Amino acid sequence: HWQYDLIPYSTYMLSLYLHIPFCQSKCNYCAFSSFALAEKSDQITQYISALKEEIKYYSQHFHHEGIKTIYFWGGTPNLLGADQLSEIIFTLEQHFDCSNLAELSFEFNPYPEEEIYTIVKELQKTFWKKYPRIRFSFGIQSFDNEVLQLAGRHTRFLGLVDFLRNLQPLKQDNTVFNFDFIAFGKWNQSKKGNPYLWTPSALQFFTDFVNSQFADSFSLYTLELFENQARKRKKTDSLISGAYFRSDEQIYEEFSLLKDILLDAWYHRYELSNFSLSVKSSIHNRTYWEMENYLGLGLNASSFLNKKELNSEFFSSLGIPTPEAGLRFKNTNSLKNYCDKQFLDPTAFEPLNEKDYLIEEFFLGLRTDKGVPQLSKFTSLLIPH
């Protein structure tokens, strides 16, 4: 029996997503709202100041809500360091009720190694007594050196091996370690023409690492390419344009191979791209798939309020009528506008009626192990036969 977590919480609570858009450099496959920042600058200070103001703004409308989860993503949140990340969390604690927080999550890169270890230790020291779960997700992405190079990553296989081995002493009882991988679809060929993934030693290390069950969970994604991505702007580079990143079939074959290794090691597939040991699944990510309430804070962050939490006062302040069943909305994607405290994108409000809501609930349910348990509520949407 797979329990989703051991922490009681209300589905009426709010989850908070905080977007940190700064990166050491932009990865070639990345479609997220982020940009390279060579070193810490006034932009980070200005951004944190604006983020604090946005926190205060939402607390005026949702002060009665308890906060269920807090999730830092980007970008590369570890560029801020432990002190600035803690500063943002302290601001959240001042303006929201975080006393029943179920999960505090951070997305980090696995480099620079010593800096990451220091940040993890400092965040654990600051918050391990406050919150029942601190989740760190590390973007490993691949164990293939050529893929890592072409993708614009700043580490290679042996560096990742060292990172994972040296990370082990930092594990605590209330710490969850998640590791992200992407199926890029690059297969090598042996002299006999047989395809193989990565190198034999890299694939064996992955298998041994998974079987050790040091990792609490894995996220396994497939490469997706969009018109605005850096890779699309490098069509003149033959290596990137087709030599390694090939067909959807090859991408799926890599995904399938890695997926089977995870399943054989008793990681439970609780969502299409996510696998975990018992009670170690991401509490925050389930809020998306189960259409619970969340606010996105920061540049280009998305929010959703469902029909259980339609705050008419909040909608009045936006100058829009209260939606029938829910509302999706986004922040501006202009860093200048955001730092000038113009947070919301006025063109990105998507009200949901009852039919819209049911359609989203149905298809999001298909993504998870919970499925669509009450099929009868969707009969009005289903086509006969």
Protein language model regions, located:
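Hydrophobic, secondary-structure "cap" segments at the distal end of domains
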Residues: 286-290, 296-385
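Extreme N-terminal starter segment of soluble prokaryotic enzymes
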Residues: 12-16
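Local cysteine-cluster metal-coordination motifs and their immediate loop/turn environment
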Residues: 21-34
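Short, solvent-exposed loop/turn segments at secondary-structure junctions
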Residues: 24, 143, 225, 276, ...
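A C-terminal junction/extension of Radical SAM enzymes
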Residues: 233-314
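Conserved non-cysteine loop/helix-boundary elements of the Radical SAM core domain that shape
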Residues: 34-61, 67-260
